[in-house]
């Protein structure tokens, strides 16, 4: 990748719009689930999987099953995304409510 394309890629990354939403990580082997929220739910899996592969994930409850069953037994699901024009002041509270709702539905742990 030449210098100009790299600069363009970095600029595009910095200018992308947030995608606020709720996601789940599910272990196929045990049926365990973890639910979290993100301001970039569309790219959240990359960061999670990176930390889990290295063994440096801040989520110990997720790291242990990952180590026991391996990456192939896990899946990432985007459960819900807030619309782009959702009011900024109530966004955090709404994400917490929706996370709690999905945790109850899936009988999941918090991320």
Predicted regions: what they are:
Residues 2-111:
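Structure-specific nucleic-acid interaction/processing domains
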């Amino acid at each position: 990748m030449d210098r100009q394309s790299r600069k363009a890629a970095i600029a595009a990354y910095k200018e992308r719009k947030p995608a606020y939403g709720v996601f789940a990580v599910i272990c196929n082997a045990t049926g365990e689930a973890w639910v979290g929220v993100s301001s970039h739910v569309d790219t959240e899996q990359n960061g999670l999987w990176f930390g889990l592969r290295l063994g440096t994930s801040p989520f110990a409850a997720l790291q242990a099953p990952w180590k026991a069953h391996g990456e192939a037994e896990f899946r990432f699901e985007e459960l819900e995304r807030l619309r782009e024009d959702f009011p900024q002041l109530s966004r955090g509270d709404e994400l917490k409510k929706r996370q709690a709702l999905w945790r109850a539905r899936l009988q999941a742990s918090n991320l």
